[in-house]
A protein has these predicted regions:
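Non-catalytic, glycine-rich low-complexity segments
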Residues: 1-38, 90-164
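Aromatic-rich carbohydrate-binding modules that target alpha-glucans
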Residues: 23, 31-73, 79-98, 127, ...
Length: 197
């Protein structure tokens, strides 16, 4: 673990949190890292096998890590105990990657993205798959797309070319900008993050 990188998450100074948080292939498996302030214990549950792996707390501010013995990145979710006697199940936003098509970002950089409104702002979406292989349904309210194999959520994107970092905040994360830092998408100045329901 790179402690300097971890500190950039803790102090909200990283514009590419996906380079630290979420799943990463390493020697021996897949390293999963999360920043969950106030959590007492965290488990990773593989959706494929149903197996639970306890995460180690690597930093007193709320950084957790676990090594999943797997050759490839698989879908998973967190099971979190905040010490209030309840279990909270949460999907990892950093499992899904960028949802804006690369061509749309290239057009935006060139000043010819006439439909960028389709991506900027907050949009309910449904996704299937993980990482770079994710398929996005930008119209998840249609009856034909309400399928159990798709993850429902909201995709947030904003153009902030001079920002050091951008976060999604609200009641759902105690207005804590460290909990959902957005990812800088290439050289476009756009930051984005998909937050599953």
């Amino acid at each position: 673990m790179d402690w300097a990188e971890i500190e950039t998450i803790v102090y909200s100074e990283h514009d590419h949190p996906e380079n630290i948080l979420g799943p990463h292939k390493v020697k021996g498996g897949v390293l999963i890292q999360a920043f969950l302030p106030d959590a007492k214990t965290v488990f990773v549950r593989s959706k494929k096998s149903g197996m639970f792996i306890q995460m180690s707390q690597t930093d007193e501010d709320g950084c957790f890590a676990a090594l999943m013995e797997s050759r490839k990145i698989v879908s998973y979710e967190y099971v979190i105990d905040y010490g209030d006697g309840k279990e909270y199940w949460q999907k990892d936003p950093y499992l899904y990657g960028n949802l804006i098509p690369e061509q749309a970002l290239e057009d935006f950089n060139a000043g010819k993205a006439y439909d960028i409104y389709r991506y900027l702002g907050a949009h309910p979406v449904a996704v299937k798959g993980i990482g770079k292989d994710v398929l996005v349904d930008w119209n998840p309210m249609a009856a034909s797309t309400k399928r159990s194999d798709m993850v429902q959520g909201t995709f947030f994107a904003v153009w902030a070319p001079n920002a050091m970092r951008v976060s999604v905040v609200g009641d759902f994360n105690q207005w804590d900008g460290r909990r959902h830092p957005m990812c800088r998408l290439g050289d476009s100045g756009v930051f984005g993050l998909f937050i599953p329901d």
